[in-house]
């Protein structure tokens, strides 16, 4: 195992907050805009906030970069390239750094993916969520299974590494149905799967529908059975869990996920992004403004969009470390 795989690492998280549509289960910081987003304005804001972060972190060797959202695949490849150039200007990026971009199957085009690859992206994470058209409609996804399979094939032929997400413990889902879907997913996956139980989050459309009795989720016993099945099937097929929801072939674990789980340092740039890094020897937390346009305005005024944060005490650090 190389040093880059052993160390906690230093990560950069970039939040692109825009989506084509808001999924009914999602409580992430994502926003729909019906007019084109001024991507150049955001590129300038990302560059300014990164320069601010560099002044606070000092020199670091970046081992992972993660474009999350939102839907980062709505960014033009040139936008991704410009953001990566800003990261390179502020820190040294390891030659073996993992650079991941989240994408939705509905926004996948071969030429666009080649553009991301040429910009420097070497890993893609697809929001597939289900391999069943009825459940995709229930989840409010804009793609169907055929589009998902096509996106997976394009991603596998374009990037060295691929992951995709599935949501399970969906209403009415049986162990037999989930086992078959999981088996198909493992056959399609290159080396990594992120498998999440459906949770009903307050403030989402699903929360209101669930409260109104419009649908039911599996009871805790049934959900636990689906979780056990998930662990058994993935382990038997060579993709054991390396943390709660992520499964990988040995050596294909997400380095950026491991930054979090190994209590490494990372900076977060963009609307709503969080960071945790050492500043003057103390572990510092930063939290950025969530609303995209307000974040941009703050960066333009102050050089950053950070609105909250703290320096952790030793006891707080110890508590966080134990939770990892």
Give each language-model segment a name.
Residues 12-16:
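Short active-site neighborhood of thiol/selenol oxidoreductases, capturing the structured segment around
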Residues 2-11, 29-56, 60-324:
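C-terminal scaffold of the Radical SAM
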Residues 17-30:
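Local cysteine-cluster metal-coordination motifs and their immediate loop/turn environment
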